[in-house]
Amino acid sequence: MGDLELLLPGEAAVLVRGLRSFPLREIGSGGWNQQHENLEKLNMQAILDATASQGEPIQELLVTHGKIPTLVEELIAVEMWKQKVFPVLCRLEDFKPQNTFPIYMVVHHEASIINLLETVFFHKEVCESAEDAVLDLIDYCHRKLTLLVARSSRGGPPAEEECQSSTPMQLEHHVAPQELQKQAELMEFEIASKALSVLRYITDCVDSLSLSTLNRMLSTHNLPCLLVELLEHNPWSRREEGKLQQFEGGRWQTVAPSEQQKLSKLDGQVWIALYNLLLSHEARARYCLTSFAKGQLLKIPEIWERLERENRGKWQAIAKYQLRHVFSPSEQDLRLQARRWAETYRLDVLEAIAPERPRCAYCSAEASKRCSRCQNEWYCCRECQVKHWEKHGKACVLAAQGDRAK
């Protein structure tokens, strides 16, 4: 593990320096896709660094080059695209893409960024380098956790098969737009769990946060009350056939009876955040603010409001532009993209950062055999592979063609 590297230090520095914000109209474009690939590489390298305990150059590079605010703006931009543009795009009469792979990349982008932020925000200097963007990040986390509470009160957590996150190379060749919308909604559950971790890391810095940041957490959003709601609804726990299951590592796992009295990782994040917000000296001293002070501190411009103001009334125009120029790629473009993703998602790296053993693509049992053709899907036995071929076949052919194109 310690010797495994996806990026050399010089390569990582170049990728970090090149990070920039994109207008909503350019989301899904060639330049945007290139940055998405770069973010995935940085993401995987950051996880490798943290796992190997070798120091974390990705985190240091992001701080040195002042790119944390850029990541926050990109995070909120794609969140807005999913809320404002994506539904309009799916309703267009001529929206009949031959391949939904490019759209999935955009839907997956939010999860990629929040995962990278979760990895690096463990370090206090990252929170400090976010500057004013930390306010927007707090707003973002508040939105995600509010939706998580609302979802758990409506009908509980998503099912096992709904929570499985896929790499782009595991995505089907063609998925109906309605199915893509469903996948985007289901992905919100894991995104919210990452947002909780990021918020907890921000509260770790409560003694050094600005007055406006504390005010945003304690007065504007009243985060202590929201965190108590999370503990009450406990959306990351459920009972299936009488057995307690908890959501950890991107999947539902059965908890042994001897382990059921222990706090889950997500429960622990909530309790630590509550401790930081309610018992730290700085938070207690600053909880009560005058109306005048609140009004002054809330005048800080926010990324969400600026992006919405810049694009208000343009959602349909953006959707139509992206339908013509972004989400209708040629077969050659798709094969090129498949080849580039095969290079990005190196199998040795994915196996190194995987939280547990691979699972069978058909029955979800622990798997030891990989598809010999594309090397992307795992199976527990030959019978499961045969049964899954009808669903996996097209994606397998596309991936194999991408490998041969190298």
Regions found by a protein language model. Give the residues of each.
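Cys/His-coordinated zinc-finger cores
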Residues: 370-397
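Short cysteine-rich clusters marking metal-coordination/redox-active sites
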Residues: 360-363, 371
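Extended alpha-helical interaction scaffolds used for oligomerization/partner binding
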Residues: 2-359
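Eukaryote-specific long, low-complexity intrinsically disordered regions
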Residues: 398, 403-406
